[in-house]
Amino acid sequence: MSIQTDDFAAPPPKRILSGAPASPNEEAVERALRPKLLDEYVGQAKVREQLEIFISAARMRDEALDHVLLFGPPGLGKTTLSHIIAHELGVNLRQTSGPVLEKPKDLAALLTNLEKNDVLFIDEIHRLSPVVEEILYPALEDYKIDIMIGEGPAARSIKLDLQPFTLIGATTRAGMLTNPLRDRFGIVARLEFYSPEELASIVRRSAGLLKVPTDEKGGFEIARRSRGTPRIANRLLRRVRDYADVKGAGEITLDIAHRALVMLDVDPQGFDLMDRKLLEAVIHRFDGGPVGLDNIAASIGEERETIEDVIEPYLIQQGYLQRTPRGRIATLAAYKHLGVTPPAAQSGGDMFGAMRPE
């Protein structure tokens, strides 16, 4: 079994509480901490149970697993699951991303080199170009592709047979997938944010692999501030380890974890400066909302896509922000978190002020 990886095109953000990998070095550390079997995978119980059945059935029949679509916020384990699926099937994994596949020939080169029942993992699959997506359809349905040979009047199309394979597509934006592409996935799984208890198990496992002494309370303190995201939990664990080595005795205790996370500006709810800036902007500059995403982005100096994909989902999931047809609204929990008295409208009157368009 082999794993091959193409470099991803999009530069990742460097925010410590981002669910995206911060650097190639971090990706290497993540690979070392990544579970290799479903039995080692923590969380996503329903998805794990489904995959155990589907993978076992595919192995019993000696056929390719149905194509899999994994979607959800960044850092929840989509890439990890793709590696686990390939490992459980005992096949090779070829990994790439949507932006890398610029031309049909780029995808054709990958597909024609796959062996029987191999797994092709495409991250950011919603960013595939339409021309590349077109040649993917017959590959997914019939294991065939049409490619053009030559140019101009002499050009001709030839049909190539492919080995049966499994495509695993991952995306943070399932709504941006075209209907024809979405309909070709036989297995669709949404990954949810993790509970603090699940993240505490991940922190314990990672601390063991990193050989970092960590007591139960110290590990849980990291877990509960990790925004429900394993990648963030592992990142914070490494930063707290640094603090423990320099400012402590090398062991992560509750006190060490608390002091390190305060230094990193991560509060008990798992919010950082950017989260608080967003909530403060909605409350102080836009009277609590509703306010459009473009106005928020301009106000806090952040990209609209980063707010939508990285910052906003956790705030909404935790009940600090509401997304409405007229814009974003700060909830009573947001006012309380910032120590601000909510206006009378929030307490019982009309919550929705003048509309600010998206």
From Swiss-Prot:
Residues 268-358 are annotated as: Head domain (RuvB-H). GO terms for biological process: DNA recombination; DNA repair. Residues 1-24 are annotated as: Disordered. SMART domains: AAA (SM00382). It is found in: Cytoplasm. It is an enzyme of class 3 (hydrolase). ATP binds at residues 33-34, 75, 78-80, 141-143, 184, 194, 231. Mg(2+) binds at residue 79. Residues 5-194 are annotated as: Large ATPase domain (RuvB-L). Residues 195-265 are annotated as: Small ATPAse domain (RuvB-S). Gene3D superfamilies: 1.10.8.60, P-loop containing nucleotide triphosphate hydrolases, Winged helix-like DNA-binding domain superfamily/Winged helix DNA-binding domain. HAMAP family: DNA_HJ_migration_RuvB. Homohexamer. Forms an RuvA(8)-RuvB(12)-Holliday junction (HJ) complex. HJ DNA is sandwiched between 2 RuvA tetramers; dsDNA enters through RuvA and exits via RuvB. An RuvB hexamer assembles on each DNA strand where it exits the tetramer. Each RuvB hexamer is contacted by two RuvA subunits (via domain III) on 2 adjacent RuvB subunits; this complex drives branch migration. In the full resolvosome a probable DNA-RuvA(4)-RuvB(12)-RuvC(2) complex forms which resolves the HJ. PANTHER family: HOLLIDAY JUNCTION BRANCH MIGRATION COMPLEX SUBUNIT RUVB, PTHR42848. This is Holliday junction branch migration complex subunit RuvB. It comes from Albidiferax ferrireducens (strain ATCC BAA-621 / DSM 15236 / T118) (Rhodoferax ferrireducens).
